[in-house]
Curated annotation (Swiss-Prot):
Record-linked NCBIfam families: crcB
A GO BP annotation: cellular detoxification of fluoride
Record-linked InterPro entries: FluC
Transmembrane segments: 10-30, 36-56, 71-91, 99-119
Family: Belongs to the fluoride channel Fluc/FEX (TC 1.A.43) family.
Purpose: Fluoride-specific ion channel. Important for reducing fluoride concentration in the cell, thus reducing its toxicity.
GO molecular function, one term: fluoride channel activity
Residues engaged in binding Na(+): 78, 81
Domain of life: Archaea
UniProt-annotated location(s): Cell membrane
Regulation of its activity: Na(+) is not transported, but it plays an essential structural role and its presence is essential for fluoride channel function.
Gene name of this polypeptide: fluC
Name of this chain's protein: Fluoride-specific ion channel FluC
Source organism of the structure: Methanopyrus kandleri (strain AV19 / DSM 6324 / JCM 9639 / NBRC 100938)
C-alpha cells in the first residue's frame, strides 16, 4: 500500500481545483456544434495529452516531487477531464440522435487514447538525449 501524506493530499486538492476551473472555462468558451458538446471533448483530449506527456516525461528522467506529480496528474488532469459529464452528454445525445451519441462517445475515447499517445511521443521528443 502506498503511503499518502497530507502534502500530497493538499497538492491533489489544489490541482483538482485548478483543473476543474480550467474545465469550466474551456467548456464555456467552446461552442456546441450542432448539439455536439465540443468543450467536453476538448478538455478530455487536452487532459489525456497532458497526462501522457507528464507520466512519460517522468519515465524518461524528468524529476518531479511527489507533491508536484500529484498536483499535476491526479489533481489537475483529474479535475480537467470528466467522465461523468461525458456519460451524461452521451445519454442526452442518445435521446436526439443515436448516431451522434455514438460518434460523441467514440470521439472521446479514441481521441483520448490518441492524445495520451501523442503526449508520450511529445515527451520522448522533448526528453530524448537529456536523461
Amino acid at each position: 500500500m502506498v503511503k499518502i501524506g497530507a502534502r500530497e493530499l493538499a497538492a491533489v486538492a489544489i490541482g483538482g481545483a485548478l483543473g476543474a476551473v480550467c474545465r469550466y472555462l474551456l467548456s464555456g468558451l467552446v461552442p456546441q456544434v450542432r448539439g455536439f458538446p465540443m468543450g467536453t471533448v476538448l478538455v478530455n483530449v487536452l487532459g489525456s495529452f497532458v497526462l501522457g506527456f507528464l507520466t512519460w516525461s517522468t519515465m524518461l528522467g524528468l524529476r518531479l516531487s511527489p507533491e508536484v506529480r500529484a498536483l499535476a496528474t491526479v489533481g489537475f488532469c483529474g479535475g480537467l477531464t470528466t467522465l461523468s459529464t461525458m456519460a451524461y452528454e452521451t445519454v442526452e445525445l442518445l435521446k436526439a440522435s443515436p448516431v451522434l451519441s455514438i460518434l460523441y462517445l467514440t470521439a472521446n475515447v479514441v481521441l483520448g487514447i490518441a492524445a495520451v499517445l501523442g503526449g508520450m511521443a511529445a515527451a520522448h521528443v522533448v526528453w530524448s538525449g537529456r536523461a
